[in-house]
Structures are given as C-alpha cells and as structure tokens.
C-alpha cells in the first residue's frame, strides 16, 4: 500500500462560494475511492498582491504552490472564487495507478457533463483532447499522479494507458486529391448550400467516440442513418413516379422497419448483416441505456458510414 496524490488541471474553471474553500469530496474512479481537495482562500486578501499567473488560492497540502495557478478570487470578502486545478488523494497499490489513468477520461467526461447540465449552459466548449507529454513520457488527460514516500522526492507515475489505435498506412496515388477534387472542395466550401444532415450528424457521432461518450455516438449515428435511408427511399419513389412516400413512411417508423422497407423495395443494403452489426448495437443502447465499448462502437459507426456514403453521394444540400 502507498499514498498517492494527483493534480487534475480542469478544462474549464469551476466557480465556487467561499464555503467550498479548502473542502474535500469523495468520488470513485476505476473502483478506487479518491478524495478531491479544493484549494483554500487566504484569510486576508488584497487584490493587488497576487498575479493572474500565480493565482490567489492556497494549494491543498501546500504542494505545488509556486508551480500551479490553483485559482482566482473574484469577489472579496464574499470569497467567490474560481478553481483551475484540484488535488486528488488516495491510498492504494501502485498497480492501480494505470487503471485510474485509463478510467479518468470517462470519469472526467461524465463530471464535465454533470457540471454542464447543472449550470444549464449547454454551449460550453468541449473538454480538451489528450496530448503526449514532451518531458516525462506518457500521455496527458489533465491528470498527473505522484507517489508520496517519506523523506523522498515525489515520484511521478507515467500515464501509459493504451490509446485507440491510429492507423498508419502507406499513401498511394489513389488516396491523393487530384486537381478536380481540390477545386470541388474549395467550391463547395464557398457554396451557399449546407452539408446535408446525415454527414453533420456522423461527424458529431465520431467526435463523441473520441470523448468516450459511446452511447451518444451510437444514438446520433442512428439518427444520421435514418435520415440517409429515408432520403434514398424518397429518391426511389421520385425516380419511379410513386406518390405514396409520406403515407408509406408512416407505416415504417423506426430504424428496423426502415431496413425492411429497403428490402421490400429491392434496394441493396451495403451492410449485409445489418441486424447484428447495427440494430443489435443501436436498440439496447437507445431503449435500455446499455453502454458499448470502444471497439463495438467504432465498428458500428463504420457500418453506418458505409450505408450513408452509399445512399448520400451528394454531400451538399440540393
């Protein structure tokens, strides 16, 4: 057993009343009970003394006082302040460190979303992406963990969590843009027409995966897929001079019935086993709130993308 501390640099400051100053709160990260400690307001405060660089607050346990801007006081003597960083403390085994590092992005995303919901400010920017540390090795999600040992300097624990694989591939001429493709990209960017909704939703879904928000990714991608399927079926009705699209659509609500509608019309579906690869992933997520893992979500999104690309060749609105 050992004692560990971590410094969590917040993506966005948390605004607090004076009663929160110096307080500690418990949470569970990867099955480990972690204490999150807030910095303290000084007993006396002169707004002209402390700089914005060093901050106004006193570090928990008086660690990293000079190296970290823990937060700023906004109103005195009311003691309204904002926090930039928190100190994390727990007792445990060194083997638990990597599991905490691995689970922290999920925990942080959930925490940030709870703050967003509680504040009602849904326009807040997204959390910062991970970075690779230039000094000290490892990756950085906003949390750095150190081991406390008596009469020894702090020992930094490297974040060696596994990242989602980055595909490295040799570039062939077929993958490179020719002059007509580049010209079309610039023309489309300057067009008054917007990108169609299925592609915009698909982009949002992929971004949700990056944030480990797998449920949102699956549900958003399903909405994109429904839009694309309906657009393809409507085009079939127009091409065959059929006038009952709106009536028939009311009989084929929900994604599963829309796939059956494609089969009824003889429209090819690019993903042959769509029941297993798409519906069996989307339905329990949407209806029962089940959470998928990275691999199943990534495979699901790729299958959704295949269908959307086949059914929506025109990227811009008509």
Task: Identify the role of each PLM range.
Residues 89, 93-96, 119, 180-181, ...:
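General structural signal for secondary-structure boundaries
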């Amino acid at each position: 057993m050992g004692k560990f501390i971590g410094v969590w640099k917040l993506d966005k400051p948390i605004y607090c009343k004076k009663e929160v100053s110096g307080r500690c709160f418990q949470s569970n990260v990867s099955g480990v009970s972690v204490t999150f400690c807030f910095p303290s307001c000084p007993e006396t405060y002169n707004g002209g003394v402390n700089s914005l660089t060093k901050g106004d607050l006193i570090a928990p346990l008086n660690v990293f006082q000079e190296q970290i801007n823990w937060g700023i006081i906004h109103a005195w003597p009311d003691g309204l302040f904002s926090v930039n960083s928190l100190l994390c403390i727990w007792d445990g085994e060194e083997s638990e460190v990597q599991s905490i590092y691995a689970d922290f992005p999920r925990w942080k995303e959930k925490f940030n979303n709870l703050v967003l919901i509680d504040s009602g400010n849904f326009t807040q920017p997204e959390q910062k992406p991970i970075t690779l540390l230039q000094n000290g090795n490892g990756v950085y999600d906003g949390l750095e963990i150190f081991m406390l040992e008596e009469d020894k300097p702090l020992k930094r624990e490297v974040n060696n969590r596994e990242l989602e694989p980055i595909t490295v591939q040799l570039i062939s001429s077929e993958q490179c843009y020719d002059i007509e493709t580049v010209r079309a990209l610039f023309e489309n960017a300057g067009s008054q027409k917007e990108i169609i909704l299925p592609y915009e939703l698909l982009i949002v879904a992929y971004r949700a995966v990056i944030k480990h928000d797998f449920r949102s990714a699956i549900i958003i991608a399903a909405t994109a897929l429904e839009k694309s399927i309906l657009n393809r079926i409507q085009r079939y009705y127009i091409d065959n001079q059929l006038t009952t699209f709106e009536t028939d659509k009311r009989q084929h609500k929900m994604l599963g019935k829309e796939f059956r509608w494609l089969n009824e019309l003889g429209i090819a579906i690019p993903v042959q086993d769509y029941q297993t690869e798409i519906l069996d992933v989307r339905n329990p997520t949407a209806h029962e709130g089940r959470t998928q893992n990275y691999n199943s979500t990534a495979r699901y999104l790729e299958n959704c993308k295949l269908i959307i690309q086949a059914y929506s060749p025109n990227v811009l609105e008509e």
